[in-house]
């Protein structure tokens, strides 16, 4: 097998093998809406380390405590190196905390700046007017509003920011995470699809969530949460050919994609996908301070001449990946009259 390393175009969704991101908004919305609004299928198995007798450990409750009128600002960046070129973006979002129609605190964010490959992208009037409502308040649901008027270059930053909130929301829903080292495993395993039925005729991945309250710094009162998206013991993805069952990594394969070319041939890939998301939050307020996402996919790919994927060429092995960083930017101080809202 030949081997290559590819850092794929940035998107909140898992990656596609050759031609860029796939399912960008759909997978982020799936995380933000289905996993969080419909938590019934999820099963959490919590584990807490045993502390030595008499020892005390810093404690924190992972919850967001909003202040009405609180100002929010983020810079989010993504780096990608393809086989032939390197691509990157950096974008800035800013907004204010308000209550929505149901009385729930929401971060009402707009997008102010966007650079792609070190060139500033002029945002259209519709993109500047777009509002991304995000909330970590208890009982709040994450979702995306209508994106039809937003220019394409802004879709990745919008969905990538949502993905960080979705992961932190999953962690905040694990109420056993109160001390450094506390751990919860959230089993899901059902496939997420990004197939469009035309070019991508099959595209699925499946993950569980391995969540750890890694540390609480007593000096800075910053809590670090790690959310790993890991292959389930038995991923429920569809593998149409027997060769796809052979493990690409050290777990069962949890990523599959089949593309139909304009010439009637098929590009079929299978692999192991993981995410590692690290989020630093202010322990007292739950506000995000910074975050990183690392998303590698180890892939074995074949070019096939039949729809059954049995008449295929030699396998090609490579690694997809992307890295995203998020940081909170300084904002003006709150007016003294604004009191914390819990």
Which residues fall in each region the model found?
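Signature of exported/secreted
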Residues: 45-342
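Cleavable N-terminal signal peptides
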Residues: 32, 42-44
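Hydrophobic membrane-targeting alpha-helices
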Residues: 36-41, 78
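N-terminal secretory signal peptides that target proteins for export/translocation
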Residues: 1-21
């Amino acid at each position: 097998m030949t081997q290559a390393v590819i850092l794929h175009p940035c998107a909140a969704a898992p990656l596609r093998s050759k031609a860029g991101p796939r399912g960008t908004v759909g997978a982020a919305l799936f995380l933000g809406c289905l996993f969080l609004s419909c938590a019934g299928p999820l099963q959490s198995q919590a584990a807490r380390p045993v502390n030595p007798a008499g020892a005390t450990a810093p404690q924190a409750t992972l919850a967001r405590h909003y202040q009405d009128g609180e100002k929010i600002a983020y810079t989010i960046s993504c780096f990608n190196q393809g086989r032939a070129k390197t691509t990157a973006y950096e974008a800035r979002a800013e907004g204010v905390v308000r209550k929505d129609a149901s009385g729930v605190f929401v971060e009402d964010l707009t997008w102010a700046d966007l650079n792609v490959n070190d060139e500033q992208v002029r945002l259209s009037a519709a993109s500047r007017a777009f509002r991304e409502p995000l909330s970590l308040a208890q009982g709040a649901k994450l979702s995306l509003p209508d994106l039809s008027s937003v220019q394409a270059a802004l879709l990745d930053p919008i969905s990538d920011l949502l993905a960080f909130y979705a992961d932190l929301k999953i962690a905040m829903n694990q109420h056993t995470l109160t001390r450094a080292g506390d751990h919860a495993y959230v089993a899901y395993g059902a496939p997420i699809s990004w197939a469009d039925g035309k070019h991508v005729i099959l595209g699925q991945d499946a993950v569980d969530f391995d969540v750890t309250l890694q540390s609480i710094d007593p000096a800075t009162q910053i809590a670090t949460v790690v959310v790993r998206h890991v292959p389930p013991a038995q991923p429920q993805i569809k593998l149409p050919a027997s060769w796809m069952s052979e493990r690409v990594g050290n777990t069962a394969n949890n990523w599959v994609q089949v593309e139909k070319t304009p010439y009637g041939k098929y590009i079929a890939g299978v692999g192991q996908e993981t995410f590692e998301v690290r989020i630093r939050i202010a322990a007292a307020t739950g506000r995000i301070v910074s975050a990183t996402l690392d998303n590698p996919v180890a892939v074995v790919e074949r070019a096939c001449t039949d729809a059954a994927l049995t008449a295929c060429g030699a396998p090609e092995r490579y690694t997809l990946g992307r890295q995203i960083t998020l940081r909170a930017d300084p904002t003006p101080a709150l007016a003294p009259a604004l009191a914390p809202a819990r």
